């Protein structure tokens, strides 16, 4: 049957409806319950290094991270947390801080009540919160401290530190089953059960769903998709997405984007982190940028103006369009922190920097402002289009500088004080 004979019920392209979850407030940030999908990140500083951690949280926040997780692994780190919070507040930064606890979180939160108060959310790993007869007691201790301080909790299972007693139990049951499942399927079930059983236990202690976020991270793309599909189908807790140990560079970006993109398209996920291994001395804010670009590319949110640029081919032997596209993109990234306040709505701007006559004029017309640079053998002229209309033709060695000035002028007139109100639909 021809596809046109059986059209889709909805002609509007887009993701599936968001999975209905219970909204959780983390500081002043809403997670789940239909709220915009939240971008978060994690520091890699020694939390006991107060100034270093303040500086990195500030950079992550400025880059667009809406929540930042910090490691709280020992006494010195726990003692530093309130000073970190206070130092950030002095800079005007109110980004919620999440404490990442393993093994001794119950003790650190009890011994350092100022730490418990300063954090906005506690992350509990059900695989190492305690072992054997201590597990329930230590888990209960953290939940009760969260209740006392009115804090949110993320119950985050991870298959690198999965609850071994639960996994062994499920493996033993599977071994004697008449229809045994694949070992990886049993491991995925253990991940989901670990999160859900812990959440049920937290509710028994008194922690409401409005204070709980769940995650179940693995490092395999296909397993991650299956785990979160299962988790979402069996609960309405707010969900944090992330591919653990995604890796470095393009590999980590591609793997995380593939996994999270599929889940987001299916309506699953209330907050995300792109867990990238930074290059030595690399910029930690890259994971924030990638998370934002994923959400913006898929149409969930807008963070910064988009710069469209053609990939280049034999018609574009000049590097001018590439250099201009990079220059405009970098310029926008640098200016966005100030622009957010000065030019409300500027994040919806679309800029096109094209390299030849084939797609250049058409793509430039689709953008708010676009330029079509000449390709090899073409007339050395670059038409500029504003809101679909050709307004000027640039020539000579100052094309790049002139176009950047036109972009700035467009922003000032479109989004500056006194400009008409701009909506995302525009």
Curated annotation (Swiss-Prot):
Q: Which GO terms describe its biological process?
A: isopentenyl diphosphate biosynthetic process, methylerythritol 4-phosphate pathway; terpenoid biosynthetic process
Please verify whether the record's keywords include Ligase.
no
Which positions are annotated as binding [4Fe-4S] cluster? 310, 313, 356, 363
Q: Which UniProt keywords apply?
A: 4Fe-4S, Iron, Iron-sulfur, Isoprene biosynthesis, Metal-binding, Oxidoreductase
Q: Which reaction does it catalyse?
A: (2E)-4-hydroxy-3-methylbut-2-enyl diphosphate + oxidized [flavodoxin] + H2O + 2 H(+) = 2-C-methyl-D-erythritol 2,4-cyclic diphosphate + reduced [flavodoxin]
According to its UniProt record, the EC number is: 1.17.7.3
Cofactor binding notes:
Binds 1 [4Fe-4S] cluster.
Q: Which cofactor does it need?
A: [4Fe-4S] cluster
**Family label:** Belongs to the IspG family.
Give the protein's recorded name.
4-hydroxy-3-methylbut-2-en-1-yl diphosphate synthase (flavodoxin)
Q: Which gene encodes it?
A: ispG
